């Protein structure tokens, strides 16, 4: 069904998505005797301990106990009742949650040891299909892409959730991430931010950490350009393959509105026509997550725009074609900088990575190399191989298999060399899987 002048009126999904933020049995009696007395004493001591734990709990235990589990056991396992004990709170995208900020705050008060200690915890979420890849090299590339994310998270104190299950079969392909992110927010109330990273994105700067303080007044961050969104009205004005979303009620409502333009909606076909007519550069008549996101921001009176941060100051997500060919030169610039900074060349434990990353950042600034982007020499934070489809092999017709394959391998080796350095190795070349030992005091100035 195509959009026409006489098309039926649709209630905008951001209106539907916006909501008000509201608020044992006793054992048989034993026969008398020393053993029986000892058993009775032990049972009494255990019962007394359970009563003390129950009385000391700040949460009410008046609700009916679950089948087969005593209330004392529940209190010991979970520290008292939380939103997890409410059957009305669901993990699925079709079951809206209300009062999430209060529910999450209550859980954090009950689990202060998991509250982050004043920092903002980040959960990276990524994933791939459950079945084997169609491309011959696809599974190998996915393994290396997963390793890349594991490396970054280990070095920078980020948790990683990698999912291979299709949580909502009706929302597949680019829509599949929304149900996963929604479930992750409920499963990880300790995380202030959920960071979605497409499987075909490579973390190419192991030193860089998300500048969370600059997003303190925002709830959603994507790589994009305001003038392309609001003036050019382009569906490629931002990229939805990598985004940062705050774990809050606003975000749950935002994802409900976003998903309402997806394949679960009875108006899905109509939304495809609306988006195609709205974005003149959109070449396929289908409602996709990225076009839907731009459309939500464009609408007058949108409740989302003020809380969305379009990041363009660094490669929050960078287009691989403008990055892959520059990686070798970037390596040379870094090595030239380190030849003049002996402390940076010092061998160190991997656990000291954060300290050396901070020192390297300071040295970059001093050498005038801190600028990111096309004109800068800082390592790109994320290199996104959008359109390459390394698993299926069904790449964009504008890209050759060689350019995609070599680009991904270059980016992975570039990132892996930063990790291997702590182990005394590096790749023999940008397209080589072989590694060689690093000489002492690498990279020293040569004659």
Swiss-Prot record:
Keywords: Glycoprotein, Glycosyltransferase, Golgi apparatus, Membrane, Signal-anchor, Transferase, Transmembrane, Transmembrane helix. It comes from the Eukaryota. GO terms for molecular function: galactosyltransferase activity. The keyword Transit peptide does not apply. Residues 1-31 are annotated as: Disordered. Belongs to the glycosyltransferase 34 family. This is Probable glycosyltransferase 7. It comes from Oryza sativa subsp. indica (Rice).
């Amino acid at each position: 069904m195509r959009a026409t002048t006489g098309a039926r009126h649709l209630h905008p999904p951001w209106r539907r998505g916006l909501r008000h933020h509201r608020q044992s049995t006793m054992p048989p009696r034993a026969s008398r005797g020393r053993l029986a007395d000892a058993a009775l004493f032990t049972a009494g001591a255990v019962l007394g301990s359970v009563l003390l734990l129950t009385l000391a709990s700040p949460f009410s235990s008046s609700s009916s106990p679950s089948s087969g589990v005593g209330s004392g056991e529940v209190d010991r396992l979970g520290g008292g009742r939380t939103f997890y004990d409410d059957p009305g709170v669901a993990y699925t995208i079709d079951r809206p949650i209300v009062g999430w900020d209060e529910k999450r705050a209550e859980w954090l008060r009950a689990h202060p040891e998991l509250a982050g200690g004043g920092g903002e915890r980040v959960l990276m979420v990524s994933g791939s299909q459950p079945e084997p890849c169609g491309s011959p090299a696809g599974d190998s590339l996915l393994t290396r892409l997963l390793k890349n994310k594991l490396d970054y998270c280990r070095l920078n104190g980020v948790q990683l959730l990698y999912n291979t299950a299709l949580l909502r079969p009706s929302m597949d392909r680019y829509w599949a991430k929304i149900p996963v992110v929604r479930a992750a927010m409920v499963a990880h109330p300790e995380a202030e931010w959920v960071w979605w990273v497409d499987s075909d994105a490579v973390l190419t700067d192991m030193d860089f950490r998300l500048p969370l303080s600059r997003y303190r007044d925002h709830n959603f961050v994507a790589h994009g350009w305001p003038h392309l969104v609001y003036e050019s009205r382009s569906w490629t004005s931002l990229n939805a393959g990598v985004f940062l979303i705050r774990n809050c009620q606003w975000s749950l409502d935002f994802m409900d509105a976003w998903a309402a333009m997806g394949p679960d909606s009875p108006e899905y076909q109509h939304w495809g026509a609306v988006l195609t007519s709205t974005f003149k550069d959109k070449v396929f008549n289908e409602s996709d997550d990225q076009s839907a996101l731009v459309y939500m921001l464009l609408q007058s009176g949108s409740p989302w725009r003020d809380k969305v941060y379009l990041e363009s100051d660094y490669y929050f997500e960078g287009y691989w074609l403008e990055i892959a060919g520059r990686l070798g030169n970037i390596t040379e610039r870094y090595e030239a900088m380190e030849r003049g900074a002996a402390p940076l060349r010092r061998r160190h434990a991997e656990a000291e990575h954060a300290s050396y990353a901070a020192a390297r950042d300071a040295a970059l600034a001093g050498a005038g190399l801190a600028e990111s982007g096309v004109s800068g020499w800082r390592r790109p934070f994320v290199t996104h191989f959008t359109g390459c489809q390394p698993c299926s092999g069904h790449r964009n017709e504008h890209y050759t298999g060689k350019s995609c394959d070599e680009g991904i391998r270059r980016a992975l080796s570039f990132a892996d060399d930063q990790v291997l350095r702590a182990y005394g190795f590096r790749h023999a070349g940008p397209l080589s899987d072989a590694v060689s030992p690093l000489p002492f005091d690498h990279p020293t100035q040569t004659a």
